[in-house]
Amino acid sequence: MASIEEIAHQIIEQQMGEISRSHTEVSQTALMDGTTQRIQLVPSESSVSVPQRIQIVTDPQTGQKIQIVTALDQSGTNKQFIFTNNDGSLPSKVILARQDSSQGKVFLTTPDAAGVNQLFFSTPDVPAQHIQILSDTQSLDQNLNKQFVELCVVCGDKASGRHYGAVTCEGCKGFFKRSIRKNLIYTCRGSKDCVINKHYRNRCQYCRLQRCISLGMKQDSVQCERKPIEVSREKSSNCAASTEKIYIRKDLRSPLAATTTFVTESKTSRTTSLLDSSMLVNIQQSGVKNESILLTPNKVEACQGDLSTLANVVTSLANLNKSKDLPQTNTEFSIIESLSNGDSSLSDLAQDDQSNSEVTRAFDTLAKALNQSENSTQGSSECVGSGSNLLPDVNVEIEGPLLNDVHIAFRLTMPSPMPEYLNVHYICESASRLLFLSMHWARSIPSFLSLGQENSISLVKACWNELFSLGLAQCCQVMNVETILAAFVNHLHNSMQHDKLSSDKVKLVMDHIFKLQEFCNSMVKRCVDGYEYAYLKAIALFSPDHPGLENVSHIEKLQEKAYMEFQDYVTKTYPEDTYRLSRLLLRLPALRLLNAAITEELFFAGLIGNVQIDSIIPYILRMETSDYNSQIIGLTA
């Protein structure tokens, strides 16, 4: 049985014998049982004198109709052809032809991008001629007066010009620009050979980007646009990254299967910021709603309300201190006392009502950063009381258990809604909520208040990183910690490639991330419950070995009490797991190896800039309990 190529050869021989005929002569026979229907292809421009021919035949093997077209002459100019019939009927099909840059290839297609998948071959019988096979399966109806249309080399859509070194449409131009500027990394679900055309170009972003690059779109052109040499801007250290976008893909089931990356171009005054204004992430997110939401800066503000807790506090207090030229170390308690107790001393620090309201609003937002149940709220109010009435620094014997059911609940509310397109603010705000929740948890322990004001603040300053890391492990699934850490790792790789971070800095931060990831994974693997997390936090909180502490013996007794209660709980709850207590306690030394400064840079620098967490802790601990709980968003029962 004859193949398609043999049929093509036979037809070309017939064509060459009939090429001298007038271009108006047409013979037509019925299209059936492999017979040939011959249609003349007339050039629409007078510059082409020799008529071209097209024949439609039926493949004997498949029954598919095949168009066999003789190619252009070797002039290389773009030409437009139309089909005509000898009966004088109006033509209804258009073919666009252009010479390819490579020798011996001619592209023939239609303005609607049909026929972009083409097969070229030549025969010895037709020197310097080439033919092309197109499947005759799509409608080619077009306006006869339509001018030659240049097509996108990537998807075959109508091209709008040359972009980044290749002729593309606006869609592929924008896709390529976004992908390169944000340094996005995509994943192909298939075999990395997906069909990219006008209708399916959005199905696989990986293959689309690879096709853009392979067809000549230059990444360097986009980089030059992204980073103008002549423009130098100084960005605010506070909330610098709150308007940038983070891309989160929600098409994968597992939160652990993530491909993420960050890009950064600016540096802060304390080394190089690991979370700056141009840092972007592509995270594959699971367990969230299906609809796609784009959070622009305005929408971020609208949906999050006053949830920029740390940023608002830092900004307001900094403005207040700056306006009165007062050192922060000398005013931190007086400012908080004025807010908490309603004293008139606030007006002495800031004479204008604007400064007054700024600080008040800042602390109003702190209440919205926590998620406590109603029972937890009532219990905290009963056992803690007013934050302004911290007990004096005396050795008080604590009767009853150190922790009760009120201290077990640790429910973190994430910023809502969970959109598909996020910004860096979302990660920093989530970490901010976790930090405030951890501080509030410590304050809810009566024994903690018995240590006195300075001792309690010193303890939290010394161990906030340990409490925060334990909170990360406890809220690992809620916060999607795995994807965030993966994003940090890819960001470091990018920074090394662009020489934005020193190798020593990258090694230090990478080591920190791996330690934090290993700790979270180990806790998740051991299925640590809420009681165990609470006792581990209490043991870390009441550590007497931190420098600068007073009444160390009392702190040591509290730690021993926490250990004894922890031992009793594990023995009763997990009687068959003999070594469970030992394994959990052995995880605590790993927390001491985590660098608090790096944790600040990773999770908070994008929100509060160069302000250190240590300087914010006293303000948080001095807040009224009612300030924490009166305006909580999304209480859970």
UniProtKB/Swiss-Prot annotation:
Keyword vocabulary terms for this entry: Activator, DNA-binding, Metal-binding, Nucleus, Receptor, Repressor, Transcription, Transcription regulation, Zinc, Zinc-finger
Broad class of where this protein is predominantly found: nucleus
SMART domains (UniProt xref): HOLI (SM00430), ZnF_C4 (SM00399)
InterPro entries assigned to the protein according to its UniProt record, in alphabetical order: NHR-like_dom_sf, NR2C1/2-like_DBD, NR2C1/2-like_LBD, Nucl_hrmn_rcpt_lig-bd, Nuclear_hormone_rcpt_NR2, Nuclear_hrmn_rcpt, Znf_hrmn_rcpt, Znf_NHR/GATA
Annotated NR LBD domain residues: 383-624
Keyword Transmembrane helix: no
Gene Ontology, cellular component aspect: nucleus
CDD domains xref list: NR_DBD_TR2_like (cd06967), NR_LBD_TR2_like (cd06952)
GO biological process entries: cell differentiation; negative regulation of DNA-templated transcription; negative regulation of transcription by RNA polymerase II; regulation of transcription by RNA polymerase II
Pfam families: Hormone_recep, zf-C4
Stretches annotated zinc finger (NR C4-type): 152-172, 188-207
A GO molecular-function annotation: nuclear receptor activity
Record family assignment: Belongs to the nuclear hormone receptor family. NR2 subfamily.
Stated role: Orphan nuclear receptor. Binds the IR7 element in the promoter of its own gene in an autoregulatory negative feedback mechanism. Primarily repressor of a broad range of genes. Binds to hormone response elements (HREs) consisting of two 5'-AGGTCA-3' half site direct repeat consensus sequences.
Name of this chain's protein: Nuclear receptor subfamily 2 group C member 1-B
Taxonomic source organism: Xenopus laevis
